Amino acid sequence: MDFIKSLVENKLLLIGNFVLTSGKISPYYLDLRRLSNYYEIFSDTVNKAIDKIKNIDFDMIIGIATGGIPFASFISCRMGKPLGYIRMEKKGYGTDKILEADVSGRKILLVDDVATTGGSLSKAVEIINSEGGRVVASLVIVDREEGAEKKLGEYGVKLISVYKIREILEYLLNSSLISDNDKNNIKEYLVKNIE
């Protein structure tokens, strides 16, 4: 699969031991903040995402800083939808806003690069909803399948992903792109953590 090969070749999928935002230790890390550096694969990913959300009724896109902003921006431009973004913490200067958008009365598509447990996404949903918006769906490039779908479901928000981590890792496990030791670590992680 071109997407997965590109992730490995461009060091956007790293193998090792990584601490995630959720606090979990993972044998792989998706560094999708740089995916937009590779136009062809990024453009293809955006096209696939648009195909998955074309029947969702929303009127504004909110990207989560920082990983979700490039993805949200491309989708916004291609679909002709207004765009805003949300930080996970105040910046401490200027207007000190967390949400950079007027979401009142709007149906929101929330966008990020990766979903793991759903902590950041659910926090963003709460903030947007408290400002008068209504998150109708959340879109990510990769769902790590570690609870985000269930967590967002508690808010009535559907999680849509372009790729599931299971398909990415299964491809890697059946390839010569990573070592046998790394394959074993990933298999062990899959058994313990993937829904």
From Swiss-Prot:
A GO term, aspect molecular function: magnesium ion binding
Pathway recorded for this protein: Pyrimidine metabolism; UMP biosynthesis via de novo pathway; UMP from orotate: step 1/2
Keyword tags: Glycosyltransferase, Magnesium, Pyrimidine biosynthesis, Transferase
EC number(s) stated in the UniProt entry for this protein: 2.4.2.10
Gene Ontology BP, a term: 'de novo' UMP biosynthetic process
Essential cofactor(s): Mg(2+)
Positions annotated to bind 5-phospho-alpha-D-ribose 1-diphosphate: 87, 91, 112-120
Entry-linked InterPro entries: OPRT (IPR023031), Or_phspho_trans_dom (IPR004467), PRibTrfase_dom (IPR000836), PRTase-like (IPR029057)
Alphabetical list of Gene3D superfamilies matching this protein: 3.40.50.2020
Swiss-Prot/TrEMBL catalytic activity: orotidine 5'-phosphate + diphosphate = orotate + 5-phospho-alpha-D-ribose 1-diphosphate
Enzyme kind, highest EC tier: transferase
Residues where orotate binds: 116, 144
PANTHER family named in the record: OROTATE PHOSPHORIBOSYLTRANSFERASE (PTHR19278), URIDINE 5'-MONOPHOSPHATE SYNTHASE (PTHR19278:SF9)
Family membership: Belongs to the purine/pyrimidine phosphoribosyltransferase family. PyrE subfamily.
Function: Catalyzes the transfer of a ribosyl phosphate group from 5-phosphoribose 1-diphosphate to orotate, leading to the formation of orotidine monophosphate (OMP).
Quaternary structure, from the entry: Homodimer.
The protein's name: Orotate phosphoribosyltransferase
Organism: Sulfurisphaera tokodaii (strain DSM 16993 / JCM 10545 / NBRC 100140 / 7) (Sulfolobus tokodaii)
Gene name, Swiss-Prot/TrEMBL: pyrE
